Amino acid sequence: MKDKTNLTGLNPDNFRSVINGKDTGLYILRNGSGMEMCVTNYGAIVLSIMAPDSHGKFENVVIGFDTLEEARRQSKDYYIGATIGPVAGRILHGAFRVGEKDYHLQLNSVSNTLHSGDNGFHTVVWEAQQPCENQLLLRLFHADGEAGFPGNVTVRMMYTLTDDNGFRIDYEAETDREPCSVPPIMPILTWRAWELPLLPLKTIW
């Protein structure tokens, strides 16, 4: 049975769990135009984005999941909807040097490290706060040495549905290491799989 608290019909009970001592849940964002987004704080996964087309009909424009178990499986195998970090992309041979120190990571893509390995940001529970109906603040502490990366890092990410039916993501990261002691870039990525309705063929925006 579809839940009536959100346009997608996702049941909040299907996303309530405790993983590594942290609570997971379903968060619903809405803007003043009725656009709606559902998110779980596991992996900061976006589960649905209900956006209006040019006729005012709402459609889900991303590939999403009905349960936490399905979202965990798909984000682990295919990263769908999840936030990738500390480093998105491939690290050649799973190794890098910062200053005079070499770091070696898990190899999960033949002889390389893909999207920070199997214990990246997409596999952890983020702290979540909803300051207002159209925003969700997600916070993560990534300890020194976790997944093989140096430095204690605090990541803050804000999901916002704008009044013009946009989806904005703001990232912020702080570390306790000197600039020369951590990787010069932290390319975090929120992986979206867009699913634009094709029937009938029409202009959505």
Which residue stretches match the model-derived regions?
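Surface-exposed acidic/polar loop and edge beta-strand patches at domain peripheries
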Residues: K2-W205
